[in-house]
Amino acid sequence: MATDVFSSKNLAVQAQKKILGKMASSKYIATSLIDDTSGEVLDELYQLTREYTQSKKESEKVIKNLIKTVIKLAVLYRNNQFNEEEIALMEKFKRKVHQLAMTVVSFYQVEYTFDRNVLSKLLNECRELLHQVIQRHLTAKSHGRVNNVFDHFSNCEFLAALYNPFGPFKQHLQRLCEGVNKMLDEDNI
């Protein structure tokens, strides 16, 4: 995003992205920027990821990358940094995330409907749309963060373990779906 023209607004947006990206590393600051329901869902995703990976470091990295990405996306959106094409892609991304959330909850609520390939495909469609939205705004490092998050959550083995009705993650899935359902009810997703 290098240009020869100085722009205070662009400089301010870059500073916001940088500061909020650093702040997202602190759980206290991140929770102050995220509503209670979203925080509960993120906490559940962290616990689930930690138990699945058996790695505190890896699970913290995935959730931190998710939070940083969401915050940077919000900064760009609130500062009107997207052109018309990107706004259209952002709307498409929001609809796809909403569809994903409804599918996650539906697969939990209706027995024997879970299909890991469907969820993985939806997650990867979200990833591609997000990459298109942020293409000209965020660095390769930020794109790597997006891939880290989606690589983890779209992994078919992870999804199969999560939805296994006899597996160790049943309670996590229940709490996760309750939170996602609440976010859907509140129009937060």
UniProtKB/Swiss-Prot annotation:
Gene3D superfamilies: Tumor necrosis factor alpha-induced protein 8-like (1.20.1440.160). Pfam families: DUF758 (PF05527). It is found in: Cytoplasm. GO terms for cellular component: cytoplasm. Its main location: cytoplasm. One of its GO terms (biological process) is positive regulation of apoptotic process. GO terms for molecular function: cysteine-type endopeptidase inhibitor activity involved in apoptotic process. Keywords: Apoptosis, Cytoplasm. Acts as a negative mediator of apoptosis. Belongs to the TNFAIP8 family. This is Tumor necrosis factor alpha-induced protein 8. It comes from Xenopus tropicalis (Western clawed frog). The gene is tnfaip8.
